[in-house]
Each structure stands twice: as C-alpha cells, then as structure tokens.
C-alpha cells in the first residue's frame, strides 16, 4: 500500500486494452464527470489515466475508461495541473487501501 507503480506508454489505447485483459480497471480523470474521485473504489486493481493539461483525455481514450472521475474546483480555477491532479488521485488510492487494510 505504500508503493504505486507509474508507467508511461507510447500507445495508450493498446496499453488500456492490455490492462483490461489483465483484469485492471481503468479510471480516467475528466473534469466534467459527475462522479467525484473519492466515490470510486480504489481498493480494486486500477490504473488512473491522466490527459494533457490543455485538452485532457482524447475522446477515444475516454470511451475505453471504465469510469471517468472529476476533481471539482471552486472559484475561478477550472482544473488543477496534471501533477497536482495526479497527487490527489494517488493519495486517494493510498488512503482507501490503508483504510481497507485496517479493517482486516
């Protein structure tokens, strides 16, 4: 629970297909999603897909995701930069898995 694997791939679409074949859920960061980041079960085997800061996830990648999750913002800021968004998502993964391990 104290280690998260990070991967950079050259073909994201094929990588997502492979991950799904391995039984791994794919959660994409999408600001307009109605599902907030903490509502997803990150105790599952999951990968988080983050888009570019300017345009987010491409349409074909969004369609491949099992869930689209948002980090709602207040005020004039529309979104976090990708590094800050990654930190929020990764912290939530660790938080849920830590809570889950304490229940056992």
Residue ranges of each PLM-predicted region?
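Residue-level recognition of oxygen-bearing side chains
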Residues: 11, 45, 85
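RNA substrate-binding interface of SAM-dependent RNA methyltransferases
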Residues: 1-35
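Short, basic, helix/turn surface patches
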Residues: 6-15, 55-63, 102
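Active-site/ligand-binding-proximal alpha/beta "capping" segment
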Residues: 27-81
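Surface-exposed beta-strand edges and their flanking turn/coil or helix-capping segments
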Residues: 21-22, 41, 52, 83-84, ...
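Structured adenosyl-cofactor binding patch, chiefly the S-adenosyl-L-methionine
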Residues: 2, 59-104
């Amino acid at each position: 629970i104290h280690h998260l694997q990070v991967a950079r791939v050259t073909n994201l679409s094929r990588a997502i297909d492979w991950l799904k074949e391995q039984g791994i859920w794919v959660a994409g960061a999408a600001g307009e999603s109605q599902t907030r980041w903490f509502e997803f079960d990150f105790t599952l085997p999951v990968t988080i897909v983050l888009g570019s800061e300017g345009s987010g996830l491409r349409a074909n990648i969004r369609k491949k995701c099992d869930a689209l999750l948002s980090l709602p913002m207040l005020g004039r800021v529309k979104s976090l930069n990708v590094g800050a968004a990654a930190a929020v998502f990764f912290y939530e993964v660790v938080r849920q898995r830590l809570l889950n391990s304490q229940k056992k």
